[in-house]
Amino acid sequence: MEIILGVVMFTLIVLVLSGLILAARSKLVNAGDVVIEINNEADKQIRTPAGDKLLNTLSSNGIFVSSACGGGGSCGQCRVTVKEGGGDILPTELSHITKRDAKAGCRLACQVAVKQNMKIELPEEIFGVKKWECEVISNDNKATFIKELKLRIPEGEVVPFRAGGYIQIECPPHKVAYADFDVPDEYRSDWDKFNLFRYVSEVKEPTLRAYSMANYPEEKGIIMLNVRIATPPPKVPDAPPGIMSSYIWSLKPGDKVTISGPFGEFFAKETDAEMVFIGGGAGMAPMRSHIFDQLKRLHSTRKISFWYGARSLREMFYDEEFEQLARDNPNFTFHVALSDPLPEDNWTGHTGFIHNVLYENYLRDHPAPEDCEFYMCGPPVMNAAVIKMLKDLGVEDENILLDDFGG
């Protein structure tokens, strides 16, 4: 009798616990459809299955929120305002969102789980973002580790971007061998030196990454990007190579690529202040877009200078275009500094790091550097050095504009 009673009690306990688990699950995960109200506008309302992240849910419904890191929670770009239904803010969001913004409902769409009916607010410009399937026109080396990817927009379509803007590229699952990359002979010695052709990029999940445009709005029908290959750091040689850069470097003319955009916030101020552009590496992209836009589309009369740092002449590109701009526009000057010129360069120009060259040859004797606008994009070390120099010169934050994508 005691055995039977024990079995009955055990069964009852299991049933009660199962019921509690199911009840809790029903509270935590909505298995049916939920409704997401956007900007209190009925025509923007979304009905969708619960369970995915808000970023993916919006994308699946044709609303593309910027996410430079592809939804990993590291870039902080996918900010939205959640009025109801988002739950508590997560620790992964707190490094990107201030307490004041969090109190106002600011969240990262890639971290918010869609579990229940929600009310959110999105900037109106997001609804102008579209997706296109483009064709690769060319994908040529411009420097040892930088390719210029040129894409053709579908006929009849326009990407309405502003200079300094960016697009997102979709990276499909792939297996890419670096040995199959098309690297011209003039650049192969460094690739062999660092044994880079041994790497293989294998990706099983699709992802997104953001890249700034190198073309300016008047160069219609194309998207032009500068993409640096992201190899493992020397101290961690067995780490996987960059997902997106490996994919982009493998592309060949005729291949199809899906992009979305335009996005952006690294835009030129509409003032008469002097503009000083500072770039390095693949940070060339937004510099070219901005400077070409100012001089060729807007015909700006503002005083403009461009200071670009490279290792050697082999790493220089677009320099002939900028030299021509300088000849055609007396208000524009172009300056190059090589940090490690090769003997065959026969270089007689500036040498050293670009922030030092800019200071020693221009800003040190500038009557009012605090009145200039500084636009920069380059490797993180360069950006940090330039910002420190500008702060020491008394330049306010509002006049220091940084694009974090191009380094």
Curated annotation (Swiss-Prot):
UniProt-listed Enzyme Commission number(s): 7.2.1.1
Domain 2Fe-2S ferredoxin-type stretches: 32-126
Cofactor(s) the record lists: [2Fe-2S] cluster; FAD
Record flagged with keyword Transport: yes
Reactions it catalyzes: a ubiquinone + n Na(+)(in) + NADH + H(+) = a ubiquinol + n Na(+)(out) + NAD(+)
GO CC annotations on file: plasma membrane
Main location: membrane
Main enzyme class: translocase
Domain of life the protein comes from: Bacteria
Location(s) in or outside the cell: Cell inner membrane
Cofactor remark: Binds 1 [2Fe-2S] cluster.
Transmembrane stretches, start-end: 3-23
Gene3D superfamilies given in the database record: 3.10.20.30, Nucleotide-binding domain of ferredoxin-NADP reductase (FNR) module, Translation factors
Cross-referenced InterPro entries: 2Fe-2S_ferredoxin-like_sf, 2Fe-2S_ferredoxin-type, Beta-grasp_dom_sf, Cbr1-like_FAD-bd_dom, FAD-bd_FR_type, Flavoprot_Pyr_Nucl_cyt_Rdtase, FNR_nucleotide-bd, NqrF
Residue intervals of the FAD-binding FR-type domain: 129-269
Residues that, per the record, bind [2Fe-2S] cluster: C69, C75, C78, C110
Membrane topology listed for this record: Single-pass membrane protein
One of the GO BP terms on file: sodium ion transport
MF terms (GO), sorted A to Z: 2 iron, 2 sulfur cluster binding; electron transfer activity; metal ion binding; oxidoreductase activity, acting on NAD(P)H, quinone or similar compound as acceptor
Keyword terms: 2Fe-2S, Cell inner membrane, Cell membrane, FAD, Flavoprotein, Ion transport, Iron, Iron-sulfur, Membrane, Metal-binding, NAD, Sodium, Sodium transport, Translocase, Transmembrane, Transmembrane helix, Transport, Ubiquinone
Task of the protein: NQR complex catalyzes the reduction of ubiquinone-1 to ubiquinol by two successive reactions, coupled with the transport of Na(+) ions from the cytoplasm to the periplasm. The first step is catalyzed by NqrF, which accepts electrons from NADH and reduces ubiquinone-1 to ubisemiquinone by a one-electron transfer pathway.
Annotated family: Belongs to the NqrF family.
Record's subunit section: Composed of six subunits; NqrA, NqrB, NqrC, NqrD, NqrE and NqrF.
Protein name: Na(+)-translocating NADH-quinone reductase subunit F
Organism: Klebsiella pneumoniae subsp. pneumoniae (strain ATCC 700721 / MGH 78578)
Gene from which this protein is expressed: nqrF
